[in-house]
């Protein structure tokens, strides 16, 4: 009976330690995301500039501009994404951008 109690206690401690480790990783990821949004707030790329395809369209200046990437750009090293004029739906999506004050009147 005591063996079962000890084994159960060890399992609880092990699970708890993994949970704490996951929470620390999540906190680090949240901190990095906050830094990314601060960078987006500070600067917006002009039309035609090279942008990061992994980030949101908020990095491009203007309500209708989006980060447009070529077909299969992730598999080609030389392929780069650029800020290009998008559709009207792009302006609707970009209403939630943190740096929209830069291009909105």
Swiss-Prot record:
Record-level GO cellular component terms: extracellular region
Disulfide bond residue pairs: 51-67, 58-97, 60-83, 69-81
Subcellular location: Secreted
Keywords: Disulfide bond, Ion channel impairing toxin, Neurotoxin, Potassium channel impairing toxin, Secreted, Signal, Toxin, Voltage-gated potassium channel impairing toxin
Leader peptide range in chain numbering: 1-17
GO molecular function: potassium channel regulator activity; toxin activity
Propeptide: 18-41
Main location: secreted
Tissue localization of expression: Expressed by the venom gland.
InterPro entries: Toxin_34 (IPR013605)
Family of this protein: Belongs to the neurotoxin 04 (omega-agtx) family. 01 (type I omega-agtx) subfamily.
Role, per record: Insecticidal to house crickets. It induces an excitatory slow-onset impact that leads to irreversible spastic paralysis. It also modifies human voltage-gated potassium channel Kv1.5/KCNA5. Most likely, it binds to the voltage-sensing domain of the channel, suggesting it does not block the pore but prevents its opening at physiological membrane potentials. The recombinant peptide binds to the channel in an irreversible manner and slows down the hKv1.5 current activation kinetics. It is not toxic to mice, when intracranially injected (at 0.5 ug/g mouse).
Protein name: U2-lycotoxin-Ls1d
Lineage of origin: Eukaryota, Metazoa, Ecdysozoa, Arthropoda, Chelicerata
């Amino acid at each position: 009976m005591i063996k079962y109690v000890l084994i159960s206690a060890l399992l609880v401690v092990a699970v708890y330690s993994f949970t704490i480790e996951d929470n620390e990783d999540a906190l680090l990821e949240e901190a990095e995301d906050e830094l990314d949004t601060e960078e987006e707030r500070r600067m917006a790329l002009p039309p035609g500039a090279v942008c990061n395809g992994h980030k949101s369209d908020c990095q491009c200046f203007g309500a209708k501009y989006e980060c447009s990437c070529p077909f299969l750009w992730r598999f080609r090293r030389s392929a780069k994404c650029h800020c290009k004029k998008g559709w009207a739906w792009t302006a609707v999506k970009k209403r939630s951008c943190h740096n929209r004050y830069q291009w909105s009147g």
